[in-house]
Amino acid sequence: MADLPETPAFGAAFSDEEEAARALEAGRWLFSQTCSFVMGCVSLDTLPDHDLSEIAFAGRSNVGKSSLVNALTGRKTLARTSNTPGRTQELNYFRLGPEAQDPALMMVDLPGYGFAEAPKDAVKRWTRLIMAYLRGRPALRRVCLLIDSRHGIKENDRDVMRMLDEAAVSYQIVLTKADKLKAAEITDVLARVVAETAKHVAAHPDVIVTSSQSGAGIDLLRAQLAALASP
Ligand SMILES: Nc1nc2c(ncn2[C@@H]2O[C@H](COP(=O)(O)OP(=O)(O)OP(=O)(O)O)[C@@H](O)[C@H]2O)c(=O)[nH]1
Ligand SMILES: [Mg+2]
């Protein structure tokens, strides 16, 4: 992945090289701290009470949400991953940061939307839950909306983007599985996704290209998310 194109985030997110270096260091530091599973939630009334910022990882089933949580935290089995779409079936909370000390973040690994190899009723139930959570969670500071770089933005992703625009919930597009594409294909999908994202009011202008497998883009995403940590 050495020839991954530089994502626009690098230029736009930081005003100069010094600021970029500081942000990257802060991201590496925070994501090297303790990260522990807090709880899995199957309904809105069981979401945890806390005073940290929440970052949610949303996207179609199998796009690589749980793998991204593992890559960010440098842990292989923190969040359970699988080849079978529909692996994650609860809102899984992970607390990142030093114990009883700031800065810290709550990361929420969501079930996927779209096709899943699970009973229809279960898929319907968790899809309703994800949408209600995304629309109405005050602690939610940023949604990382994951898009498989081989497929680009699909119609059900657009539905979620429109819903987040209407609810004024800040979200950032993260392209996943970049290791599966050639550099020219990544440049192409990135251009299309950036152009479409620019039309959405609640979308962060920077689109980050990642691979949980090769580690591409992971440090950059760490830097951006660490900036949202509480306090
Ligand atoms: N090549 C490659 N495979 C990946 C990458 N990220 C995830 N995968 C694979 O994609 C599959 C799905 O990954 P998960 O992380 O379980 O995806 P998910 O979005 O959490 O899936 P659900 O919980 O079922 O919605 C697994 O087989 C992963 O190994 C990546 O960056 N590169
Ligand atoms: Mg998952």
Curated annotation (Swiss-Prot):
* Cysteines engaged in disulfide bonds, as pairs: none
Gene Ontology, cellular component aspect: cytosol
Which CDD domains would you find in this protein's record? YihA_EngB
Role this protein plays: Necessary for normal cell division and for the maintenance of normal septation.
- Gene Ontology biological process terms, A to Z: division septum assembly
Tell me the protein family, please: Belongs to the TRAFAC class TrmE-Era-EngA-EngB-Septin-like GTPase superfamily. EngB GTPase family.
What is the protein name for this chain? Probable GTP-binding protein EngB
Q: Name one GO molecular function term.
A: metal ion binding
Alphabetized, the UniProt keywords read: Cell cycle, Cell division, GTP-binding, Magnesium, Metal-binding, Nucleotide-binding, Septation
Q: Does the keyword Metal-binding apply?
A: yes
Question: Which species is listed as the source?
Answer: Rhodospirillum rubrum (strain ATCC 11170 / ATH 1.1.1 / DSM 467 / LMG 4362 / NCIMB 8255 / S1)
